[in-house]
């Protein structure tokens, strides 16, 4: 769904989201993560995505730097990739503007209230805004923003770790391939 949406937003906005498909896999080193990957694959299949389990030997072929003996299960996603977060944000904002929408930066939403006619009053730190439609663009704070409208969003921010190093020739030689995710 998301990849199709990115293409549509790029077309409507004329702005690239910077999508770089490279394929990627998810690795499970314990039973809890194995069960999680099985559930994720079931959801992906239901949505028509081509994720598939691959052998640990195939993992080694796709990424020779990985020791497959540490893992129990591997899930391959052929359309996995990366986007430019600022590009996605700008493309969505521009597409909204093309369709008559407005967006406000550096404006904290304090509360929202739906009126009987279906429109919304949005109370911000810079004054009140009336809108026919509101879009939750809260990012990491989407759950909290949703609560302002009485909506419980099942969004859970996840912590990821990043490591900055000098160039590693073996990783550079892999090109654009994403490094695996898992535990």
Q: Residue locations for each model-derived region?
A:
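A conserved short coil-to-beta-strand element within the FAD-binding core of flavoproteins
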Residues: 54-58, 63, 102-120
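Dinucleotide-binding Rossmann-like beta1-alpha1 core, especially the glycine-rich loop
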Residues: 1-62, 183
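Short aromatic/basic micro-patch
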Residues: 52-53, 82, 103, 128
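Generic secondary-structure signature for well-ordered alpha-helical cores
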Residues: 4, 8-11, 15, 46-49, ...
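Flavin-dependent oxidoreductases
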Residues: 112-183
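Helix-loop-beta segment of a Rossmann-like dinucleotide-binding subdomain
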Residues: 15-26, 40, 60-99, 121-125
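Core Rossmann-like FAD-binding/catalytic domain of the broad FAD-dependent monooxygenase superfamily
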Residues: 40, 45, 51-54, 59-66, ...
């Amino acid at each position: 769904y998301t990849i199709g949406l990115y293409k549509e937003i790029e077309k409507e906005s004329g702005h690239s989201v910077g999508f770089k498909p490279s394929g990627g896999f998810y690795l499970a080193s314990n039973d809890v993560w194995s069960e999680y990957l099985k559930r994720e694959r079931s959801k992906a299949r239901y949505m028509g995505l081509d994720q598939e389990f691959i052998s640990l030997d195939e993992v080694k072929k796709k990424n020779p730097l990985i020791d497959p003996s540490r893992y129990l299960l591997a899930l391959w996603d052929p359309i996995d990739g990366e986007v430019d977060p600022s590009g996605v944000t700008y493309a969505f904002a521009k597409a909204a503007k093309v369709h008559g929408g407005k967006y406000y930066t550096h404006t904290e939403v304090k509360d929202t209230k739906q009126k009987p006619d279906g429109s919304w009053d949005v109370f911000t730190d810079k004054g009140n805004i009336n809108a026919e439609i509101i879009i939750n663009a809260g990012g990491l704070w989407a759950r909290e923003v949703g609560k302002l409208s009485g909506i419980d969003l099942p969004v859970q921010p996840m912590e990821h770790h990043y490591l900055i190093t000098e160039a590693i020739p073996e990783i550079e030689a892999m090109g654009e391939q994403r490094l695996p995710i898992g535990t």
